[in-house]
Amino acid sequence: MEARKIIITGGATRIGAAIAKKLSGKEIEILIHYNKSKSKAESLKKELQKKGSKVFLVRGDLSKEKDVNKIIKFAKSKLKFFDCLINNASLFENDKIENFTTDSWGKHLRTNLRTPALLSKMFARNIKGKNNNIINIIDQRVFKLTPFFFHIL
């Protein structure tokens, strides 16, 4: 049997790390994306390898197109094809209506919307078989902005 191949964005900490731990084991290859959590990613890699998983780490800022392209290229070179993509990474800066910037707004949209779509497109082009999954995890703040975002008192 060929190994199952999983990509997890934002996989080094919190929910992403918990998912990686739950899915890891023999015959599992996991590519973990991280941005700023290098030491946590490296520690998680060691933990998952002890459970029998083959683990790859890739760093990248999901708001930057060149980093997203690098992640896609790395994923293709290491895994060849994919069984599961978990779009878990997100960006939520603490801002309010009176101080948010168009740069911040754009970074949020690129990280939380555009990049999961681009990664899903790449995934769809590199699947093998029929039992493949894309799981999109989104924070509640997309639906409910920072408390009092539009409240000025």
Walk through the language-model features, giving the residues of each.
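Active-site loop of short-chain dehydrogenase/reductase
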Residues: 4, 53-54, 81-82, 126-140
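Conserved glycine-rich cofactor-binding loop
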Residues: 12-13
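Conserved glycine-rich Rossmann-like NAD(P)H-binding loop of the short-chain dehydrogenase/reductase
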Residues: 28-42
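The beta1-alpha1 cofactor-binding region of Rossmann-like NAD(H)/NADP(H)-dependent oxidoreductases
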Residues: 38, 59-70, 102
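Conserved NAD(P)H cofactor-binding loop of Rossmann-fold oxidoreductase domains
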Residues: 88-93
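Substrate-binding pocket helix/loop in short-chain dehydrogenase/reductase
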Residues: 96-97, 104-109
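Catalytic loop of short-chain dehydrogenase/reductase
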Residues: 133-153
